[in-house]
Amino acid sequence: MLKKYAVDQLKEGMVVGQAVYKEDMSVLLGEGTVLNQQMIDSLSERNIVSVEIREEDGEEALAPMPQKSQGVQGAPAKTIPLKEPILDEGYVRDYGDCFIELKSLFEVTKAHGSVDKDSAETLAQNILPLCSGAKAVAHIHNMTPKGEYTIHHSLHVAILAGLMGKWLKMPRKDQLRLITAGALILIGNLRIEQAMLDKEGVLTPDERKIMQEHPKFGHELIMAGGLGEDKEIAEAVLQYHERGDGSGYPRGLVKEEIGKFARILAIMDMYDAMASDRSYAKKRSPFEVFNILSDDIMNGRLDTDFGFRFIRRVCHSLNGNWVKLSNGEAGKIIYIDESRLAALPVVQTMDGEFMDLNLRKDVKVEYLLTSREIEEE
């Protein structure tokens, strides 16, 4: 039998149960290859998320002695991709715990009229372990949130912010502060009627004006408590809807008038909002979102360095995810060209066909499938 393992769970001696492909679509590790540490490190460096491992009687099939890779050059054999979603039970459990913790923080904030500093900082420490590269990106897309968009979106932004902090090599203290700010971007929604937050369709001009007050409301709730001593966190919540060309809100700031944390969170917020189902809009393909973000970067609305860095890292963390294609088929992402910004993926469909969407202009990715949607395919 075969079992999917995240790359960081692989051990020397495990036996590859299904071929792993290189960038040129030749085989990197052939079926039956016995893993050594060098191979495992190579998989991690290539942003490969998971590998199918051969098991016997429910236990890992460890080879008795190391062997050379049986990978071969040339076109890959036509195999059928397995449908198991990339979900780690421990990650899902820890995400659920952080979700409950964040929801409680929102409820206490609403009751007391201020954000509790200790609770917010403890939450950030609990979120930090969830910020684990490709695994974090895969789980954000593969899990199936049930309602509570405000909390899920805030938690997603916090996780993506933690990832960005690591990619920028921020000190751990600053990573935690950025996570805290990300978790609180929608805290101001507590002062907006739930019916308006849940409204389907376009907001009226008056409703839009009220909605655009939520950064101010959030800033006030932070400043009312001890967390207000950290001006950068409070500023980030106030400014994350500002844009470099002055078209944002609530103050119409431009370029360097916008704080560093706010410029980072603007990107995280846009990405997750468009890649998620909302009451008034269906989720989009991350690759479509990358194009929108790229346009905003080129037009000076989003920070150039943070924006391009985020797109490149997240784009190449999507390997191994399943997507719904515009022709109605489902496909598994098996390769994304790391040399190109926001490159389209090569996918393998359920009948084993390989499809390079950089060349197939008649087919595009509609959206990423959740674990539940994968099971229904």
What are these regions (language model features)?
Residues 25-28, 148, 248:
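Short, contiguous strand/loop micro-motifs
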Residues 11, 17-18, 139, 145-146, ...:
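Short leucine-rich amphipathic alpha-helices used at interfaces
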Residues 70-212, 223-230:
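Acidic/His-rich, divalent-metal-binding segments that scaffold phosphate/diphosphate chemistry
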